[in-house]
Amino acid sequence: MTFKAITGAALCATMLTFSGQAFADAELKIFVSSQHQPDVWRKAIDQYEAKTPGVKVVIETGGNTSEMQAQYLNTVMSAKDSSLDVLMLDVIRPAQFATAGWTSDFSGKDMSAYLPTYAEANTVDGKIVALPAFADSMFLYYRKDLLDKYGIQPPTTWDELKEAAKKVMEGEKNPELQGLSFQGKAIEGAVCTFLLPYWSEGKSLVENGKLNFDNKAAVDSLKLWKSFVDEGISKKNISEVATDDTRKEFQAGKVLFAVNWSYAWTHFQGKESQVNDKVGVARLPAVKGGEQTTCLGGWEFGVSAYSKQQDEAKKLVEYLSGQDVSKFMAINATLLPTYASLYKDADVTKAIPWFADALPVVETAKARPVTPRYNEVSETIRTTVNGVLAGVMTPEDAAKQMESRLRRVLR
């Protein structure tokens, strides 16, 4: 895993330029997910530096998955390292980091302007422990040109998706075309993979901090995903596919349907994309007789408890979490806003038309379990899902093992 600093000190393949004073009264270092367009965050930070004389901000990036980033940050925080001032955290992490004493509180912060889901995600034991960076949820991306060619409407159930995929794949006779790509690798995305059909059956995994495991819904979910592989709709090695693999395959024109987050849209519309202007976005399908639902995502900014520049770090986070930056990142990076009003903002909807319909999806997205022991919950679910997709476990055995392991964590 390689982590790199983005500064204006040098120009090379792994560094980006920035404008700022050569000598600053305060130099802050912020960790940003490498998957979420740090080059665009750099532009937002450039604006902050221009407005804040004497402050220089260096971006450190790294890790292509939530797990890799968390592993790195866990190491830094466990060592009480003061080198990082601001941390970009997956929405599932604030409770864990706050409980460990790794983040500073934003005392007195009014969270009412944010989408309620994100105000709640950043509040732990009544304390504001981080501020929203951007919202997110999973969507179904599809090849609009191919569905139109075969007279198919975007599917609202997984069964409809199967039928559509088989029809298009048979008609196209392209051995490289997959019907569906999703996250089967043992990463955080596989937790959402499991939960989507499980939630669609109306089941919850945790209630009031206690496990509420439904074995039938779990087996149904695992069987559904395995069936996509067995029926030739998804690739045989789907157990090796991570989030950005799905994005790259769809972008290369090799996938009909893809389950992915909002960041993928900008890539699909890029100059190197094979599907530019051929992509549609829809809500994720439901199981038969179930409800359409999706997995809540998003990222947050926390201030390291070990930062030696607490006030300056908090001012930077307040700025990056503000409405102006949220709008800037929506338009320039396709990152969903954390403010409801921006989903109807004329500039935003002109740049990203489908954002106009995204707010109800984000507002009704379901959150993964919030617990200080989330790492153990995640590891249990994602490795079990991966085992089923790799063919080393049956859905029935996997569901039993998953429940047993989760009960030891969520007592």
Language model features with spans:
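Short, polar/charged alpha-helical segment
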Residues: H36-K56, I381, A399
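Extracytoplasmic "Venus flytrap"/periplasmic binding protein-like
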Residues: K29, Q47-T117, A121-T123, D145-T156, ...
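A bilobed periplasmic-binding-protein/Venus flytrap-type ligand-binding module shared by bacterial periplasmic
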Residues: L140-K144, L296-Q309
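Long, aromatic- and glycine/proline-rich binding clefts that accommodate carbohydrate-like moieties
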Residues: T117, A121-N122, V279-A282, I331-T383, ...
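Extracytoplasmic "Venus flytrap"
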Residues: E27-A44, G62-N64, E188, G290, ...
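Hinge/lid segment of periplasmic solute-binding proteins
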Residues: L89-M138, Q153, K162, K173, ...
